[in-house]
Amino acid sequence: MSELLIELDNYLAAGLHIGTQQKTSDMEKYIFRVRSDGLYVLDIQKTDERIRQIAKLLARYDPEDILVVATRQYGQAPVKKFGEVTGAKTIPGRFIPGTLTNPTYAKFIEPKIIVVTDPRSDAQAVLESKQNGIPVIALCDTENLLSFVDIAIPVNNKGRKAIALVYWLLARQILRERGTIPEDGDLDIEATDFELKF
């Protein structure tokens, strides 16, 4: 295994590799193994590589041209924090239909690329992106379909700690790619600061 962005134990502690008991043929290539209880386990090496690739891609965009969406509760705090750190636009919470397709809507926006936390729960954002030819990056678990997703990050997209860690790593890598922090530099906040607090 090549060197990871963080220690393997940190990935494991966040449950980033924990999938579901369902899998799609789209996600099969990202699955490392099946546990005895039928739970699919994602390949952390592939997740790590994909985070690097996507950070490199997103770093080439102006921050205001990136939109990050999270409808589900556990994704909202990480998405907000990601926006604060990177300057990307965010929609945590309900995605109003027409946000990307109705120019008369007061909060209409025209991003050049979109990141969704779950292609199923963020389906409206994915659909509107496809209608406008906007590339879609999605955090995808073992049971997700990739029919409208351009690039998937294979990850547990339901776990509070896992989602926070992915957005923290993406933010850190984007800032490294932009040269905002050194190549081996760190953020001044921890991954736990991206988590939803109760």
Curated annotation (Swiss-Prot):
InterPro entries attached to this UniProt entry: Ribosomal_uS2, Ribosomal_uS2_arc, Ribosomal_uS2_CS, Ribosomal_uS2_euk/arc, Ribosomal_uS2_flav_dom_sf
GO BP terms in the entry: translation
Cross-referenced Pfam families: Ribosomal_S2
Superkingdom per UniProt: Archaea
Protein name as catalogued: Small ribosomal subunit protein uS2
GO CC, one annotated term: small ribosomal subunit
Record carries keyword Ribosomal protein: yes
Entry-linked HAMAP family: Ribosomal_uS2_A
Stored CDD domains: RPS2 (cd01425)
Organism: Methanobrevibacter smithii (strain ATCC 35061 / DSM 861 / OCM 144 / PS)
Name of the gene this protein is made from: rps2
Keywords: Ribonucleoprotein, Ribosomal protein
A GO term, aspect molecular function: structural constituent of ribosome
Family affiliation: Belongs to the universal ribosomal protein uS2 family.
